[in-house]
Amino acid sequence: MLQLTPSAAQEIKRLQHSRQLTRHHFRLAVRPGGCAGWLYHLDFVPEITADDLEYESGGVTVLVDSQSAGYLHNLKLDYAEDLMGGGFRFTNPNAAQVCSCSLSFAPNLEKNL
């Protein structure tokens, strides 16, 4: 299960509306890359695939492909603004290590096998 904070859900809806993607779905995935090995990938996509799992949180449907699901189980996605601007913040109980940028992580392999 994924959890979006109210501020994350509000920002996703704002982005979707401002980009005129109201018929698109919000996708959260992980991809190889970054200094810790895996990067979070956020996107709006026009279609749901057969491989997608759907989660509902904060009035937002979140699509997760089956390969990313184990890495994102119980993830909390927040959105916050500070002096440097706004950005999504990830709290991932499946991460053994998180890069200082907080956008890249190394998975706890025992949890994700």
UniProtKB/Swiss-Prot annotation:
* Pfam families, A to Z: Fe-S_biosyn (PF01521)
Q: Name one GO cellular component term.
A: cytoplasm
Family the entry assigns: Belongs to the HesB/IscA family.
BP-aspect Gene Ontology terms: iron-sulfur cluster assembly
Q: Which NCBIfam families match?
A: iron-sulfur cluster assembly accessory protein
* Source species: Synechocystis sp. (strain ATCC 27184 / PCC 6803 / Kazusa)
Q: Which domain of life is it from?
A: Bacteria
GO molecular function per UniProt: 2 iron, 2 sulfur cluster binding
Protein name stated in the entry: Uncharacterized protein slr1565
